[in-house]
Swiss-Prot record:
Protein name: Phenylalanine--tRNA ligase alpha subunit
InterPro entries for the chain: aa-tRNA-synth_II (IPR006195), aa-tRNA-synth_II/BPL/LPL (IPR045864), Phe-tRNA-synth_IIc_asu (IPR004529), Phe-tRNA_ligase_II_N (IPR004188), Phe_tRNA_ligase_alpha1_bac (IPR022911), Phenylalanyl-tRNA_Synthase (IPR002319), tRNA-bd_arm (IPR010978)
GO cellular component: cytoplasm
HAMAP family xref list: Phe_tRNA_synth_alpha1
Oligomer status and interactors: Tetramer of two alpha and two beta subunits.
EC number(s) recorded for this UniProt protein: 6.1.1.20
Organism encoding this protein: Desulfitobacterium hafniense (strain DSM 10664 / DCB-2)
N-terminal signal peptide: none
Alphabetized UniProt keyword annotations: Aminoacyl-tRNA synthetase, ATP-binding, Cytoplasm, Ligase, Magnesium, Metal-binding, Nucleotide-binding, Protein biosynthesis
Length: 340
């Protein structure tokens, strides 16, 4: 029986040298070491041996198996290397041929504007904060000084999921969540970019649009600080020659409140069809944070003050690039998008 095992070993080693493909190598392995292989069959003969002979014969078979498996590994490496060299030889590339350029992608104008806004405010020391788009009525309205049945709620048509859950109508809830999380640390200095949802759909409105809101809370924050920040932003976004003006307005979460206009990019303030002859274009809303909002965020309104502002990214993009219809930003028309 030992002679038979040695014969299988010698024949198999000889056949290994004749094998020329990985497929044939695998077939030979199954033929010898598989469940019905010739070497495996030798193990079944152990039942006819005496108890003294069995361990000796088993050791011979196992040693032979180890020798063959090592030989298989070496031969497999040789064949794999040969196959790779053959493939490289057959698949040579003619590098003298002219290359074929792939279509180049374009960054969406909204993405470009959002990243530019973030870059500007990060340079001023603000941090980026984010929050959920599906929001509770408390964070979206009540914590922002808009209790239930407040008349100002009619300013926004909201998408409610349940009586207490809705798609956020602004990114302001992130400000409350950040104040709650950060208190009592100062300063709070964040911008909140994100998607918001309102029931509007026309040339200048979309049911889903993007906002960037900002918040700063600390000791001694004044309206002049707000104006300085927004003036710097406007000049970095629209050009160094831009001026801004603040017009009195009303927002439930700020007091005093102001709409912010920038001098017209087209006429420089002389008056044209874009600015409707006024020389000014509205870009965002702002104001000093209402004391109640500070209290809802966990800060002492007698010791601290703050300012907030918010802008629609689509409006900023339309003004920056001269886009007249907001819906173009969402139509996925490559003729339009490839211009940016």
């Amino acid at each position: 029986m030992k002679q038979e095992v040695h014969r299988i070993q010698e024949e198999t080693l000889a056949e290994l040298q004749q094998v020329s493909t990985l497929e044939a190598l695998q077939e030979l392995k199954v033929k010898v070491l598989g469940k019905k292989g010739s070497l495996t069959a030798q193990l079944r003969k152990m039942g006819g041996l005496s108890p003294e002979e069995r361990p000796i014969f088993g050791q011979v078979v196992n040693e032979t198996r180890d020798i063959l498996e090592a030989a298989w590994v070496r031969r497999e490496e040789e064949l794999s290397q040969a196959a790779m060299l053959k493939q490289l030889e057959e698949e040579k590339l003619d590098i003298s041929l002219p290359g074929v350029s792939l279509p180049r992608g374009h960054q969406h104008p909204l993405t470009k504007v959002i990243e530019e806004i973030e870059e500007i405010f990060l340079g001023m020391g603000f941090q980026i904060a984010e929050g959920p788009e599906i929001e509770s009525d408390y964070y979206n309205f009540e914590a922002l000084n808009l209790p239930k049945d407040h008349p100002a709620r009619e300013m926004q048509d909201s998408f409610y999921i349940t009586e207490e859950i809705l798609l956020r109508t602004q990114t302001s809830p992130v400000q409350i969540r950040t104040m709650e999380k950060q208190r009592p640390q100062l300063p709070v200095k964040i911008i909140c970019p994100g998607k918001v949802y309102r029931n509007d759909d026309d040339a200048t409105h979309s049911p889903m649009f993007h906002q960037v809101e900002g918040l700063m809370v600390d000791r001694g924050i004044r309206m002049s600080d707000l104006k300085g920040i927004l003036l710097s932003f406007s000049r970095m976004m629209f050009g160094e020659s831009r001026e801004i003006r603040l017009r009195p307005s009303f927002f439930p979460f700020t007091e005093p409140s102001a709409e912010v206009d920038v001098s017209c990019m087209l006429c420089g303030g002389a008056g044209c069809r874009i600015c409707k002859g006024t020389g000014w274009i509205e870009i965002l809303g702002s104001g000093m944070v209402h004391p109640r909002v500070l209290e809802m965020g966990g800060y002492d309104s007698k010791e601290l003050t703050g300012f907030a502002f918010g802008m629609g990214v689509e409006r900023i993009a339309m003004l920056k690039y001269g886009i007249e219809d907001m819906r173009l930003l969402f139509d996925n028309d490559l003729r339009f998008l490839q211009q940016f």
